[in-house]
Amino acid sequence: MKAQSKRTSRLLILLGIAVAIIVAVFVWRHFSATPDGSTGAQQHAVGNNPARAGGRRNMPMPPVQAATATEQAVPRYLTGLGTVIAANTVTVTSQVDGQLMAIHFTEGQQVNAGDLLVEIDPRPYQVQLTQAQGQLAKDQATLDNARRDLARYQKLAKTGLISQQDLDTQASLVRQSEGSVKADQGAIDSAKLQLTYSRITAPISGKVGLKQVDVGNYITSGTTTPIVVITQTHPVDVVFTLPESDIPAIMQAQKNAAKNNTTVPVEAWDRTNKQMLAQGYLLSIDNQIDTTTGTIKLKARFANEDDVLFPNQFVNARIKVDLLQNAVVVPTAAVQMGNEGSFVWTLNDENKVSKHLVTTGIQDSKQVVISAGLDAGQRVVTDGIDRLTEGLQVEVVTPRSADTTPTDAAEKPATAEKATHRRGEKSATGASAGSTTTAAEKS
């Protein structure tokens, strides 16, 4: 009896489990098998939010920014690292020995050629000049006396009162005295020159550096220690290097400039390549290539009237070698790199995007020349590229201006949200009966 009772209990339990499973399957099928193929849970959620239902059927188009490819005349530049050097540099030293008596310049001062820089004690050279002048006077008197004696000897020789030998001897004395006078004149000129050297003047116009010798020191000629260094920075030069592969373009640019009676323009930019410092022209090209680096040296000249370039300053030199006419140009942000190479996303009249492979040319931080794959007038996407797929329709928006107020910026998203909500309500009105039922059940 107990065994039969246990079997009956088990059957009832199994029957209850079976009924529960059947009910669960029925309920699941009831909520999931809706007319539009969506699950019951989804329909329930949509019924609670009609705007959301409409949003799923009318997803907003992804916003992008676009630009139009244009035709421009684009200059071609070659860039190399350069060093500013003075057009002329003079190391001022003394040509005479003596004590430094006075300095007539201020360190860093701009001087002109001929300006007095320093004075060396002139007294020893004044004494030498006086001595030379005295010796000249003495020898000149001897010469005058010898010439008078020679004139007498010549008269006596005609009468036969003196021999020819005496006449020749007197003539030799005259020539010796003439030689002494010339030597004395040379000594005077030398003393005057030494006296002139005691006043050292600027050989060129330029800026003086820091003085290397102080007043009171004894200076010797031929010493390696300079008194001061003068650099000419008006104008100033920039020496820079370019790869040897650029030589043909440089030579062609020089030929074109010569035909037009102009020069090849060169720009000097700062170390970061963000600010142009000065504009000049190509002065010369070295006559040989550096085999170690495979580069060639070039020299450009700049007026440097505002002293923006300083000797030994590092700059980036940009030389303009060509001007590309009718080049197709797009913003740099429009060009992307993929496995197949460079490409851009173009827009048709319906604002649908299409991927185009392109060949790029000259480019900088703002724009890129498209050599092939794109025509002027085509629109390209410049922002929002990461959301694009082939054939996707997008909404072209304009970038917000910098002067937009925070209130304006806040109102725009709110307006867009209201528009989306209206589209959702409109879509919810035409929703399926299952969705409407779900919304009614919640209410």
Swiss-Prot record:
Residues 36-57, 398-443 are annotated as: Disordered. It is a peripheral membrane protein. Pfam families: HlyD_D23. SUPFAM superfamilies: HlyD-like secretion proteins (SSF111369). It is found in: Cell inner membrane. The keyword Nucleotidyltransferase does not apply. One of its GO terms (cellular component) is efflux pump complex. Residues 1-24 form the signal peptide. Residues 427-443 have a biased composition (Low complexity). Part of a tripartite efflux system composed of MdtA, MdtB and MdtC. This is Multidrug resistance protein MdtA. The lineage of its organism: Bacteria, Pseudomonadati, Pseudomonadota, Gammaproteobacteria, Enterobacterales. The gene is mdtA.
